[in-house]
Curated annotation (Swiss-Prot):
It comes from the Eukaryota. GO terms for cellular component: cytoplasm; nucleus; P-body. Pfam families: UPF0515. This is Shiftless antiviral inhibitor of ribosomal frameshifting protein homolog.
Length: 304
């Protein structure tokens, strides 16, 4: 970056922060002159204002700025930005929108919307998606208002897998022995507790994450009819979620495909880049800054 441009950028940032400290009560020219004089040192500038400011300063300030091209460029830019800011609220569309917002009932939902907007926050959830055509399963962090993701193999958009049909690494809480355990499973399909053998329904399906906890050597088992380690009694028609059972029975990875997404014309972004899930094998060491996770599990028994 050019030296003068970098100098102007640093000066502009310092001036804007400095004027904000005093709620804009310091004139722009005075702020620029002081920041130039004290090399952007806020403490010294504040002391100067408190101890040394008098009625003759304005004339001295203008004289200081006449031969300072960097300062003049910053003054002109900030003045231009300030003028744009003053003109913006006059926009009829903005006024109409603000008026409509003011007429909304103060419900809990609307209050949360205003609070989220004020804090530049988009509520999101981690959801599972599955493309039947590509036999591809992935997780995506999506806005709650528009839960949709695109299969990056066929490029078609899908709604998430229904919450009562999700499968993958499940978390179980046994009501008998009070033990919590994890293993491959699916919602509404019981697996026996590894300690007391009591059938337990999963409380949730976990998105793939790094460091999901210690791995166990317990062998997977569930009440599905085609489980490779089936327990008796089993439930006819239930499908086992474990990859080993899927491979042994020559079944696709996708247990319950996502429905194709029908667009409503919303302009809200369908994916969030911050804090998104990763795209890799679920059993691998995975990176935190990639957006998706392909659920392509191995057939190792060690994770339940």
């Amino acid at each position: 970056m050019d030296g003068n441009v970098q100098e102007e950028l640093e000066l502009e940032k310092s001036i804007r922060r400095f004027r904000e400290k005093f709620h804009g009560k310091v004139t722009l020219e005075t702020a620029v002159a002081l920041m130039r004089r004290f090399t952007n040192n806020h403490d010294q500038v504040c002391k100067y204002i408190i101890l040394c400011m008098d009625n003759d300063t304005d004339l001295d300030v203008r004289n200081d700025l006449r031969n300072d091209p960097v300062a003049r460029n910053v003054i002109n830019k900030i003045k231009s930005d300030d003028q744009k800011a003053k003109e913006m609220p006059k926009d009829k569309d903005i006024k109409d929108l603000a008026k409509r917002m003011n007429t909304l009932p103060l419900t809990e939902k609307n209050l949360k919307m205003f609070n989220d907007a004020a804090e530049n926050r988009i509520p999101s959830r981690d959801r599972q998606f599955a493309c039947k055509e590509c036999d591809f399963v992935w997780w995506r962090r999506v806005p709650q208002r528009k839960e949709v993701s695109r299969c990056h193999r066929c490029r078609k958009k899908f709604d998430p897998v229904p919450e009562n049909k999700m499968w993958g690494i499940a978390e179980y809480h046994c009501p008998v022995c009070r033990r919590m355990f994890r293993g491959f499973g699916q919602i509404e399909v019981s697996s026996p507790c590894y300690v007391c053998r009591n059938p337990v329904l999963p409380s949730c399906i976990l998105p793939p994450r790094r460091n999901q906890g210690p791995r166990t050597r317990n062998t997977h088992s569930c009440l599905a009819e085609n489980c490779y380690n089936r327990r008796v009694p089993f439930v006819a028609g239930l499908q086992c979620a474990h990859p080993k059972s899927r491979i042994m029975n020559q079944l696709p990875k996708v247990l319950h495909p996502s429905e194709p997404h029908i667009s409503t014309g919303s302009t809200i972004a369908t994916c969030l880049s911050q804090g998104s899930l990763t795209e890799n094998d679920i059993d691998d060491i995975i990176l935190d800054d990639i957006k998706e996770e392909e659920e392509d599990e191995g057939s190792d028994d060690s994770d339940g």
